[in-house]
A protein has these predicted regions:
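Conserved strand-to-helix beginnings and helix N-cap segments that scaffold or border functional pockets
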Residues: 106-107, 174-177, 270-276
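Active-site beta->alpha N-cap acidic-glycine motif
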Residues: 12-121, 129, 256, 279-283, ...
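Boundary at the C-terminal end of the N-terminal hydrophobic targeting segment
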Residues: 8-10
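C-terminal domain-boundary segment and adjacent tail
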Residues: 21-25, 117, 187, 192-193, ...
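Active-site-adjacent pocket scaffolds in enzyme catalytic domains
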Residues: 12-32, 152-156, 160-253
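Metal-dependent polysaccharide deacetylase catalytic core of the NodB/CE4 family, i.e.
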Residues: 62-64, 81, 89-173, 197, ...
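Non-membrane alpha-helical structural segments and their capping/turn regions in soluble enzymes
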Residues: 77, 140-148, 226-237, 270-273, ...
Length: 304
């Protein structure tokens, strides 16, 4: 008899954050018999002048802070299109996690990027990533209004109304999950504690939770742990290849999923893109790995 790992069994119980019922979605294999679904999700974000990620904390007190602002502007204007081109060139699906204010704030950049990725699923990511984020602690009604405004803005500026959600800075609460479901969204990237898909039964409907592991998010590794793109390249390959090895060692093991957070600040530079190219080229060689997008995962799992 095969015994599921404790981490899998733990999903068939109340969610530890929201206390809502949560159950694993059982997937024996992905299309083509593959066992590890990998979706790279590019975070296309807007911060505003003087706000956002800081590469050089020692210079952040300058006014204006030209060095760190240049770091951010380069990522937005050069990094996003470069990554769009790279994924198109290698014919690897890409998912897009979008701040609602981005397309209007940077219309030329958005057009240039979207021309390279016209069919990439768009996942809503709040209004911006600095001063217009989720109103946590202010009740369900205000969160619903914020999420609705986010969806309306994205639909107006891109022509696409998202069905997925990612909370800015992965900062949310139980009201967020209920509000997401209330506004007609079907899935979230806010699950950071598993290798398998699960379903969250909120009072307003069911949400599918796609695994978005903390350790694989490039921004945290880059800014908090001071890892270079080539070091993150090694981490990503180790992470996915080990999941594939586990699957080959135990063929009856549940198929796994990992959505990997990708930011233009880290991998949108020429050296970062070179690392990204090596990651994708290596993963394409593994017949256990399915490189795909978030919506294809939902469809294959039968939950879209």
């Amino acid at each position: 008899m095969f015994v599921f790992p404790a981490s899998v069994l733990a999903q068939d119980s109340p969610d530890w954050l929201t206390k809502f019922p949560r159950r694993e979605v059982h997937v024996s294999a992905w299309p083509g018999g593959k066992k590890v679904a990998v979706s790279f999700a590019l975070f296309v974000e807007v911060f505003g002048f003087g706000q956002g990620p800081i590469l050089r904390p020692d210079l952040a007190s300058r006014n204006p802070d030209l060095v760190n602002e240049s770091f951010r502007q380069y990522a937005i204007s050069a990094g996003n299109p470069r990554l769009g081109r790279l994924f198109r060139e290698l014919d690897v699906p890409l998912s897009v996690v979008l701040n609602a204010a981005f397309a209007d704030a940077h219309p030329a950049v958005w057009k240039q990027f979207r021309d390279t990725q016209p069919k990439a699923p768009i996942i809503a990511h709040g209004i911006n990533n600095s001063n217009d984020i989720l109103p946590l602690g202010r009740g369900l009604t205000e969160q619903r209004a914020y999420i609705r405004r986010t969806l309306d803005l994205i639909a107006k500026s891109t022509g696409v109304r998202p069905t997925g959600w990612s909370s800015p800075s992965v900062y949310h609460n139980a009201d967020t999950m209920q509000a997401i479901a209330s506004e007609g969204l079907s899935y979230s990237l806010d699950q950071m504690d598993s290798d398998t898909i699960s379903r969250l039964q909120t009072p307003s409907g069911v949400l599918t939770l796609l695994p978005y592991p903390t350790v694989t998010v490039d921004m945290g590794q880059f800014l908090a742990r001071m890892k270079s793109p080539s070091e993150i390249e090694s981490l990503w390959l180790d992470y996915v290849v080990e999941l594939a090895r586990e699957a080959r060692a135990n063929p009856v093991r549940e198929a796994t999923t990992v959505v990997i957070g990708l930011h233009p600040f880290v991998f949108g530079t020429p050296d970062g893109a070179a690392s990204m190219r090596r990651v994708l080229s290596e993963l394409k060689k593994d017949d256990t790995v399915w490189l795909t997008d978030t919506e294809a995962i939902l469809k294959a799992a039968g939950v879209n």
